[in-house]
Amino acid sequence: MSPGLDLEQSFSQTLEGFGLSDQAARLIWLPLPMLLVLVAAVVGVLVTVWLERKISAAVQQRIGPEYAGALGVLQPLADGLKLLVKEDIIPARADGLLFTLGPVLVVVPVILSWLIVPFGQNLLISNVGVGIFLWISLSSVQPIGLLMSGYASNNKYSLLGGLRAAAQSISYEIPLALAVLAVVMMSNSLSTVDIVSQQTGAGILSWNIWRQPVGFLIFWICALAECERLPFDLPEAEEELVAGYQTEYAGMKFALFYLGSYINLVLSALLVSVLYLGGWGFPVPVEWLAGWLGQSVDAPLVQVITGATGIVMTVLKAYLLVFIAILLRWTTPRVRIDQLLDLGWKFLLPLALVNLLVTAALKLAFPVAFGG
């Protein structure tokens, strides 16, 4: 695993410099990673919701939000405040415990998955050696929460929506994992930092999208299905199921579903950026940038510039994919449930298996180009 800056140790040493003991410093550190992840996830959601409203308005030749702040940038905050003050209703015949636990099981694994997303060589909360495996494991918890919410609502539309959500998630989880496995095979690591580092040799030409074009398409299609974005929004199809598993929810419980959906979309876009688009890497080699500045690669100026712009590059790549996902919402029709399951089991799964086998063969035949 690539060595990186130990954020916990650096934080503890800084506090010890102010006279705090090592134990006190570590105690203060404990809640900070999750707080940072939560803030980053919420900010990402606010930006994405505003972008979706404005882009959707542009596609439909409308103006969109414009009164809540300049260009309507405060509209997502207004939406959140509205949901915060709405009454929290639990249906009379619903299972109260499962009804409350369902949204929590949906949103918590998605937020925890942000722990493994690197925004730079040393800029991540936790450089877990099995980060990809951790993310896949956490994402497999979400269908349980969706099915639980649909069942606990004691509503036929909610139950059908929960069953659809669970079936859809399971169907697309497997080809998604196989697509990621091909990338892991090339980088020889389950660490997201190592996967990005493997793509930083020759700028844009090193990105995995050129060596894994089929895997990239499989991953992106499966990610959209996991996020329940059009054309894969069958679990909450308004014309068929009212609002699916969300039908009986209101107030902050509904807000958790809303939040989880957008956090998952931004997370999926960030992971595509990390796995296939070079993450924090520049489109040109860093050596070229250092040459233009007349500095060595290890010079402090070059390190500061690459560190700052690495964050920008990761976010820009991710939001380009978010933009594409928003456009797809308004340009593609919803598929039927049988078409959705056929696509996952009869097309994407065999294609992902073939892609994995071809990647293994190419790794043996061309070890330098495919990470042998």
UniProtKB/Swiss-Prot annotation:
Pfam families: NADHdh (PF00146). The chain crosses the membrane at residues 27-47, 97-117, 128-148, 166-186, 204-224, 266-286, 308-328, 347-367. GO terms for molecular function: NADH dehydrogenase activity; oxidoreductase activity, acting on NAD(P)H, quinone or similar compound as acceptor; quinone binding. Its main location: membrane. The keyword Membrane applies. Its EC number is 7.1.1.-. It comes from the Bacteria. It is found in: Cellular thylakoid membrane. GO terms for biological process: aerobic respiration; photosynthesis, light reaction. It is a multi-pass membrane protein. PANTHER family: NADH DEHYDROGENASE SUBUNIT 1, NADH-UBIQUINONE OXIDOREDUCTASE CHAIN 1. NDH-1 shuttles electrons from an unknown electron donor, via FMN and iron-sulfur (Fe-S) centers, to quinones in the respiratory and/or the photosynthetic chain. The immediate electron acceptor for the enzyme in this species is believed to be plastoquinone. Couples the redox reaction to proton translocation, and thus conserves the redox energy in a proton gradient. This is NAD(P)H-quinone oxidoreductase subunit 1. The lineage of its organism: Bacteria, Bacillati, Cyanobacteriota, Cyanophyceae, Synechococcales.
